[in-house]
């Protein structure tokens, strides 16, 4: 009799595993192999027909892959029995499960057993089985029969064949392209899955409007660090640090990468002091030596006051500042009056505490400071992030052990395509989201501007069609009513997803997507040296549906999209150069092309044969890369933008006029890597910003100036509203996963008990939460973990669709916020709202 997955048995096993982990590592930390008493023993990935219990594994087939329950891309091993995924465990050969520093990962590593302690995955990774076998998954293409696209209207879905769906969608796309309106196609993509082929499709089709999820996530942080030190995502070397200062980041629960809880807790165990600045006592703050409760949106003021003390008392790293930075004098003059007393009035933090924190941070070596969405999701978030990033510069805290590391994420290489003449014409059209107005904008676009323009009938033209891949803007973009109004203005909305999301409910066509356990991807992991992991199908698509990249390629074939050289891209293997009929084989050829062109230099088949199906550069982490001299052979092909003997002269791979990329700078008379900023150094003052204006037309300050955020409490709306994420769920995606709902079934509104008492409220009350933009109900939870001036919700709940289990659980915060973006970066402002809270009257 064939094996059939039993969800009830699986749930008991999952809860038992999580419970075991919680006893030793905190309720929602990462789950390590040692939780099942496997410890450092081997985890063979070959089929195990005899059931070698000494390795802690059942009989069956173990297939390595990479998780996609969130953007962390952890390595996983999947136990497959008769074509059914029965269990998911960590992949001990993948650094992304263990550490971002090579010396830590390789200590005790063997190709036979992997890393010494065993890797980890989080609760979501374990629950990936239920994401695959969710009974509410979409199974067949659907076409809308009801022209009414308002929320709550019955779409009157008609089931159609895949051929009909693709033919009709291709016909609508062809009509746009043939009429010279290819730019009126909008495209939204999740940014960790098959993004290259989507970008290729949009380019060959002729639309400049390819956008990704990142502008909902961390583009403010990327803008801050890129402006300061030329890298969008420096990585914290916690495990070697002695002082860790975090602004608005919860890495032990809101796990961006599953190695974070391990390296942070190991650092604390080894004597590091941990300080967390946050309005909410997060799980990380609860484990810290000190929680600094701050008013939302005032992180920049605190950072400037810390800098004031460090400079005033001459505690900064003078040799580093003199050699590797510019603009220090301007910056020092700016912070001269940014005293702890000044910041104390703004942040609510006592001046004496600010003085002490500054001295601790500057005198404890090595020190690491970092910030994520806490500061970044406010309208002043980019400048706050710059002020925080410059604290690291003051103490020489970049690319040295125990500091913020310059990542070396060389992996597979995306081969840029040249469009044909037809596409080239419409690609010259401006982006509909007006990205060019955002001086520190990101290639992912500006979702908020896009939806606001569409809803209000503004923008450079009127889009006609949107393809939305694994995105649910009705839940994830601030301003639900604005998003709904915008979507209703489209002639055609196509959604590709595994679930009937709130956005899919408004679509004209819904195509079933694949779960990550059914498809391919290459994942260039976010560690400090080059690593590429493989996501590969461990089971066949449950409903016979094509993977998303196959759907896109099938549309490309129907449209006959060609490159500028006349090659029909989606029919000819990018590596082999020969026609490939099978869509899966064509995509495998594309992945091999990217691997061969990138750091691994191997094919997909060769990657599959490596331990854990992960390529790891054995050279490991390099420190002080900014001081590395450019090799003579490379320098011979480069060009200088000035005198090669003059400090500050830039070195480019080709002339700047031809789009040359900066690869180095002359510093100390030597051609070194430096920092990839306009000056080649860390920039306390980004002087090039002085000529820029933000999206509102306001001049941009070259210094990390503090200004209050746009939305402030008023007598009518007196409370700040914040949100956060936890390891129990992924954004708005997992609330139909019954295993994860066993851990976190809803999201009550958290309020300080003193605030509740003042408002005549009590724990358990049903309350209204109202802002100038919307109103919603919530269940009240009182806790001293919340700042008295603030209320907050875990983001992701409050679904009206997605599935039978998700619907009606908890509260969505998106309806309470304006559809506004940071005027510098385009970051969605998920924390920019103030509310009033009052008891819901029972009727």
Task: Cite the ranges covered by each PLM segment.
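Extended redox/cofactor-interaction regions of prokaryotic respiratory oxidoreductases
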Residues: 2-7, 198-264, 270-272, 277, ...
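Active-site phosphate/pyrophosphate-binding segments
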Residues: 306, 326-447
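N-terminal export/assembly segments and adjacent metallocofactor-ligating motifs
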Residues: 2-315, 337, 350, 554-555, ...
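Short beta-alpha connecting loops at secondary-structure transitions
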Residues: 289-294, 531-541
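Flexible glycine/proline-rich, aromatic-decorated loop/lid segments
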Residues: 283, 501-534
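Flexible, glycine/charged-enriched surface loops at secondary-structure junctions
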Residues: 180-184, 316-321, 368, 399-406, ...
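Long, contiguous, secondary-structure-rich segments that constitute the structural scaffold
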Residues: 548-610, 732-750, 754-843
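N-terminal leader/propeptide and maturation segments of large enzyme subunits in energy/redox metabolism
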Residues: 137-164, 315-351, 538-676, 743-745, ...
């Amino acid at each position: 009799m064939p094996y059939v997955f039993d969800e009830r048995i699986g749930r008991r096993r999952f809860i038992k595993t999580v419970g075991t982990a919680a006893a030793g590592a905190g309720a929602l930390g990462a789950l390590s192999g040692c939780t099942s008493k496997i410890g450092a023993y081997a985890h063979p990935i070959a089929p195990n027909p005899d059931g070698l219990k000494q390795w802690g594994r059942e009989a069956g087939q173990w297939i390595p892959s990479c998780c996609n329950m969130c953007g962390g891309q952890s390595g996983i091993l999947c136990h497959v029995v008769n074509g059914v995924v029965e269990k998911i465990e960590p992949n001990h050969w993948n650094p992304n499960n263990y550490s971002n520093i090579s010396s830590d990962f390789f200590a005790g590593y063997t190709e036979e057993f992997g890393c010494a302690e065993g890797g980890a995955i989080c609760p979501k990774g374990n629950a990936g089985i239920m994401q695959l076998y969710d009974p509410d998954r979409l199974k067949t293409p659907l076409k809308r029969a009801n022209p009414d696209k308002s929320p709550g209207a019955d779409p009157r879905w008609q089931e159609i064949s895949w051929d009909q769906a693709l033919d009709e969608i291709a016909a609508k796309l062809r009509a746009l392209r043939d009429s010279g309106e290819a730019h009126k196609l909008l495209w939204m993509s999740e940014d960790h899955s098959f993004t290259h082929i989507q970008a290729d499709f949009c380019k060959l089709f002729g639309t400049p409007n390819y956008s990704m999820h990142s502008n909902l996530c961390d583009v403010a942080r990327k803008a801050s660090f890129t402006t300061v030190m030329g890298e969008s995502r420096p990585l914290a070397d916690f495990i070697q640090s002695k002082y860790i200062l975090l602004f608005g980041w919860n890495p032990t629960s809101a796990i961006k990468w599953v190695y974070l809880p391990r390296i942070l807790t190991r650092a604390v165990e080894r004597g590091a002091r941990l300080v967390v600045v946050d309005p909410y006592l997060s799980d990380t703050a609860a484990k810290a030596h000190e929680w600094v409760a701050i008013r939302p949106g005032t992180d920049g003021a605190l950072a400037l006051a810390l800098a004031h003390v460090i400079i005033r008392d001459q505690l900064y790293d003078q040799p580093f500042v003199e050699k590797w930075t510019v603009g220090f004098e301007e910056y020092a003059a700016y912070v001269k009056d940014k005293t702890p007393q000044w910041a104390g009035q703004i942040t609510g933090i006592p001046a004496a505490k600010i003085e002490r924190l500054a001295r601790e941070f500057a005198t404890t070596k090595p020190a690491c400071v970092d910030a994520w969405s806490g500061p970044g999701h406010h309208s002043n978030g980019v400048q706050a992030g710059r002020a925080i990033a410059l604290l690291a510069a003051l103490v020489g805290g970049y690319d040295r052990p125990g500091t913020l590391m310059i990542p070396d994420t060389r992996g597979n290489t995306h081969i840029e395509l040249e469009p044909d003449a037809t596409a080239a014409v419409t690609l010259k059209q401006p982006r509909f989201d007006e990205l060019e107005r955002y001086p520190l904008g990101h290639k992912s676009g500006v979702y908020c501007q896009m939806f606001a323009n569409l809803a209000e009938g503004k923008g450079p033209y009127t889009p006609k069609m949107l393809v939305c891949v694994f995105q649910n803007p009705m839940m994830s973009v601030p301003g639900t009513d604005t998003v709904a109004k915008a979507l209703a203005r489209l002639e055609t909305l196509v959604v590709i997803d595994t679930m009937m999301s709130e956005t899919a409910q408004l679509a004209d066509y819904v195509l079933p997507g694949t779960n990550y356990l059914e498809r391919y991807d290459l994942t260039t992991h976010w560690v400090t040296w080059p690593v590429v992991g493989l996501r590969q199908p461990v089971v066949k698509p449950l409903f016979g549906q094509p993977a998303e990249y196959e759907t896109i390629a099938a549309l490309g074939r129907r449209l006959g999209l060609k490159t500028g050289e006349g090659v029909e891209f989606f029919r000819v293997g990018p590596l082999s150069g020969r026609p490939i009929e099978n869509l899966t084989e064509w995509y495998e050829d594309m992945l091999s092309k990217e691997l061969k062109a990138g750091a691994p230099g191997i094919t997909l088949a060769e990657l599959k044969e490596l331990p854990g199906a992960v390529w790891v550069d054995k050279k490991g982490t390099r420190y002080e890369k900014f001081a590395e001299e450019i090799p003579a052979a490379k320098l011979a092909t480069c060009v200088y933008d000035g005198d090669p003997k003059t400090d500050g002269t830039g070195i480019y791979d080709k002339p700047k006029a031809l789009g040359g990329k900066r690869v180095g700078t002359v510093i100390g008379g030597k051609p070194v890597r430096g920092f990839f900023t306009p000056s080649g150094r860390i920039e306390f003052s980004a002087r090039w910003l002085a000529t820029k204006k933000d999206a509102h037309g306001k001049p941009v300050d070259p210094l990390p100036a503090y200004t209050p955020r746009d939305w402030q409490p008023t007598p009518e709306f007196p409370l700040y509203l914040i949100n956060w994420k936890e390891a129990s769920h992924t954004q708005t995606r997992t609330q139909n996963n019954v295993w994860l709902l066993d851990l976190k079934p809803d999201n009550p509104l958290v309020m300080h008990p003193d605030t509740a008492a003042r408002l005549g409220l009590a724990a358990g009350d049903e309350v209204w939460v109202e802002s100038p933009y919307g109103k919603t109900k919530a269940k009240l939870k009182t806790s001293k973990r919340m700042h008295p001036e603030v209320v907050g919700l875990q983001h992701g709940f409050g679904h009206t669709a997605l599935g039978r289990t998700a619907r009606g659980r908890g509260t969505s915060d998106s309806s309470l916020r304006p559809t506004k973006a940071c005027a510098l970066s385009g970051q969605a402002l998920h924390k920019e709202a103030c509310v009033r809270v009052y008891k819901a009257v029972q009727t």
